[in-house]
């Protein structure tokens, strides 16, 4: 339903609809015709308000379309090009590139906010220092020196820098040197594990002047040398010194920190792939080879720990190290351990021979002592008559016993194991001690009775 106009303002010409007029005014491609016919006065809206609310929702005032040309000009070129795609009607020249595609220059636009995050600003400040570590106050000074915008900016940007330093994993604290006098605060450096992430964040800035170089990577490795990317903004001392940071092609960034040719990117230092872990792996391989040989050969007088993977927690690592040792690098790393093992094996073999001879002589003396003790015990038992009775009891018990194979499982479990020689020796020793105790008791009793008799005799003699 089109706008309702009073009879005095109705257009005389027929065949022109309101929709076609709105289309003409919205496109702004052709000059407007019949200004008298398209004049929509403000009272038209007031009349409709008196008629009802339903018609008011459907009607809109289109007077602002006539002033669109002046409104767009009043916004200015910078806002217009970055926000609205509508261009000046009278200008027939092709549109200029957007302001976001232009490189950022702090000298030309000192009041313009830089397009970098605070983590990128901190990264650039630390990398620009010769020692690759800075206190917080020096980071502030670097940002103020290279970006004049922050001189007049609110003071909250310093808090943002501090929060990024303390909360971001890319930055870590470093101990101060005694020679440095930086005052209060601690030094901050970049964690090498997250350095590549910061480089990627710098490359993703929308103000990069040569973003097409990263979007279309070269096909051949030789083309990497020719695609040299200038710094993000001209005249920067940081990128004059460390310009190679942002000259890494996208193929290298997508594949991580792997660099195809170190000669091409001399300024880029790839991330270390845990050198401590590599050293530990080589040492582990050498120890594992030594351990497996010691398991196969007799030990140097010490007992073998275990060959069961459940008992030995290093078993799996030793087996995996043996599989890895087939490579040439592992054989080189384990060569020194093999030399040490051969020398130790010779010494252990010589020591084992000496210890074995001494052990044999010591065992022979022990056996002779045991035989003598057994003979003495048997002689003492024969004198007491205990041995004959003990032998008879053992013989009767053997006759009464049922073979263990014929017993059920429960009785087999409850059945006590046969007494060993050590237990027999213990029983014999106990019986001897018991007999000795009885004899001592009898001797004491006889001595007491004898003393009592003597005392009585002495008393009787004294009375007489």
Curated annotation (Swiss-Prot):
Compartment(s): Nucleus
Compositionally biased region (Basic residues): 389-401
Chief localisation class: nucleus
UniProt-recorded Gene Ontology molecular function terms: DNA-binding transcription factor activity; sequence-specific DNA binding
Compositionally skewed regions (Low complexity) per UniProt: 316-336
Presence of keyword DNA-binding: yes
DNA-binding region: 113-209
GO-annotated cellular components: nucleus
Biased composition (Polar residues): 14-30
Segments for region (Disordered): 1-53, 85-108, 294-337, 381-428
GO terms (BP aspect): negative regulation of DNA-templated transcription
Keyword annotations of the record: Cell cycle, DNA-binding, Nucleus, Repressor, Transcription, Transcription regulation
Task performed by this protein: Acts as a transcriptional repressor. May be involved in DNA damage-inducible cell cycle arrests (checkpoints).
Protein name: Forkhead box protein N3
């Amino acid at each position: 339903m089109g706008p309702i106009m009073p009879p005095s303002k109705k257009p005389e010409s027929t065949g022109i609809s309101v929709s076609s007029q709105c289309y003409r005014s919205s496109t702004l491609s052709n000059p407007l015709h019949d200004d008298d016919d398209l004049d929509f006065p403000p009272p038209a809206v007031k009349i409709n308000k008196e008629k009802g609310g339903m018609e008011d929702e459907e009607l809109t005032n289109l007077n602002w379309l006539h002033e669109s040309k002046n409104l767009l000009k009043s916004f200015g070129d910078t806002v217009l090009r970055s926000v609205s795609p509508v261009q000046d009607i009278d200008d027939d020249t092709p549109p200029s590139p957007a302001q976001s595609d232009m490189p950022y220059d702090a000298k030309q636009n000192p009041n313009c906010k830089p397009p970098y995050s605070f983590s990128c600003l901190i990264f650039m400040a630390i990398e620009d220092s010769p020692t690759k570590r800075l206190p917080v106050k020096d980071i502030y000074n670097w940002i103020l020196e290279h970006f004049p915008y922050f001189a007049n900016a609110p003071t909250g940007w310093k808090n943002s820098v501090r929060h990024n330093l303390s909360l971001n994993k890319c930055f870590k604290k470093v101990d101060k040197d005694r020679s440095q006098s930086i005052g209060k605060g601690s030094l901050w450096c970049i964690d090498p594990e997250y350095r590549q992430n910061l480089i990627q964040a710098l490359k993703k800035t929308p103000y990069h002047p040569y973003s097409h170089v990263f979007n279309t990577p070269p096909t051949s490795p030789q083309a990497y040398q020719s695609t040299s990317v200038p710094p993000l903004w001209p005249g920067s001392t940081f990128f004059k010194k460390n310009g190679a940071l942002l000259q890494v092609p996208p193929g290298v960034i997508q594949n991580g920190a792997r660099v195809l040719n170190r000669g091409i990117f001399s300024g880029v230092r790839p991330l270390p792939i845990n050198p401590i872990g590599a050293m530990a792996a080589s040492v582990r391989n050498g120890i594992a080879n030594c351990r497996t040989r010691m398991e196969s050969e007799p030990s140097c007088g010490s007992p073998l720990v275990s060959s069961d993977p459940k008992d030995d927690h290093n078993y799996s690592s030793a087996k995996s190290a043996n599989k890895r040792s087939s490579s040439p690098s592992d054989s080189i790393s384990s060569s020194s351990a093999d030399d040490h093992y051969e020398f130790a094996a010779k010494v252990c073999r010589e020591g084992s021979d000496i210890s074995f001879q001494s052990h044999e002589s010591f065992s022979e003396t022990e056996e002779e002592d045991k035989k003598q003790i057994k003979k003495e015990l048997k002689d003492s038992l024969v004198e007491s008559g205990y041995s004959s009775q003990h032998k008879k009891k053992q013989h009767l018990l053997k006759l009464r016993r049922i073979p263990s194979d014929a017993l059920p499982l429960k009785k087999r479990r409850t059945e006590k194991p046969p007494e060993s020689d050590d237990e027999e020796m213990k029983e014999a020793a106990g019986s001897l001690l018991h007999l000795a105790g009885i004899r001592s008791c009898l001797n004491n009793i006889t001595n007491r009775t004898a003393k009592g008799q003597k005392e009585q005799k002495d008393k009787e003699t004294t009375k007489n």
